[in-house]
């Protein structure tokens, strides 16, 4: 590492997280260079934000710390072909998600420190909280500590993002990867979206208006999740009616029962033993045939057409939609 108090940082990728990391770190006093493909979709945006933008192979050469903030499925090739041959001896390699390292798709050079720093929020929130003097909690991990300073570099980076203003928790690459995948699949994305679709179908098939069903099972979910976010499940229960509370107590366990929990454990097992990652890599390498089929099925679900019409009348959503982060498939370097 250089003798400077602050490490020279190369941010590879400029999607939602990449942009937030780069801006926050620069505002925290770090020397930040952004590495992007020449002519790529985010090059002009990074330049407009005032960053020096060079090819990733150039960006990593003089960097003390290289943060890989590109989508999971492009990281292996990026590391092997661009980063590993050009990254200087003894530098620190940083990830925001441990999938590639934990499941041995990337084997970092032995001379490198390898760490993980993951803000627990989307990029737009990471930036917004920093700008108003607060921060988003971060988790961090050390995979390889060649210099003896890897943990300090992770903490310094997390602090530069604003994480020290909130909370910084130590984890491992294994724990971060497996819990993150499980949360996405069983609860946050897979579990929640399937629950909402099923609830909508039950009401519509029973003869209720699709518009009413949409409001009851999807639109109002935000109100509940906001209460979860602010104070946990018990806070939510404090703010709903006694009728809703009683329904929660007696009907929730009928929907999410021991069988559901057992299947959630199966999902976790597939994550832990690498089955999910193996299948995902094979799917990606095959050109995403099933992924695209599943995606199209979601787009064609009746709840989407109903929701589109109803949201068009919710004028307060327009500003929020414009400010939303880009979809994951638009966040490549």
UniProtKB/Swiss-Prot annotation:
Coiled coil: none annotated. InterPro entries: 6-PGluconate_DH-like_C_sf (IPR008927), KARI (IPR013023), KARI_C (IPR000506), KARI_N (IPR013116), KARI_prok (IPR014359), NAD(P)-bd_dom_sf (IPR036291). NADP(+) binds at residues 14-17, 37, 42, 72-75, 123. Residues 172-317 form the KARI C-terminal knotted domain. Substrate binds at residue 241. Residues 1-171 form the KARI N-terminal Rossmann domain. Mg(2+) 2 binds at residues 180, 216, 220. GO terms for biological process: isoleucine biosynthetic process; L-valine biosynthetic process. Mg(2+) 1 binds at residues 180, 184. Keywords: Amino-acid biosynthesis, Branched-chain amino acid biosynthesis, Magnesium, Metal-binding, NADP, Oxidoreductase. The active site is at 97. Transmembrane segments: none annotated. Pfam families: KARI_C, KARI_N. Pathway: Amino-acid biosynthesis; L-isoleucine biosynthesis; L-isoleucine from 2-oxobutanoate: step 2/4; Amino-acid biosynthesis; L-valine biosynthesis; L-valine from pyruvate: step 2/4. Its cofactor is Mg(2+). It catalyses: (2R)-2,3-dihydroxy-3-methylbutanoate + NADP(+) = (2S)-2-acetolactate + NADPH + H(+); (2R,3R)-2,3-dihydroxy-3-methylpentanoate + NADP(+) = (S)-2-ethyl-2-hydroxy-3-oxobutanoate + NADPH + H(+). Belongs to the ketol-acid reductoisomerase family. Involved in the biosynthesis of branched-chain amino acids (BCAA). Catalyzes an alkyl-migration followed by a ketol-acid reduction of (S)-2-acetolactate (S2AL) to yield (R)-2,3-dihydroxy-isovalerate. In the isomerase reaction, S2AL is rearranged via a Mg-dependent methyl migration to produce 3-hydroxy-3-methyl-2-ketobutyrate (HMKB). In the reductase reaction, this 2-ketoacid undergoes a metal-dependent reduction by NADPH to yield (R)-2,3-dihydroxy-isovalerate. This is Ketol-acid reductoisomerase (NADP(+)). It comes from Xanthomonas axonopodis pv. citri (strain 306). The gene is ilvC.
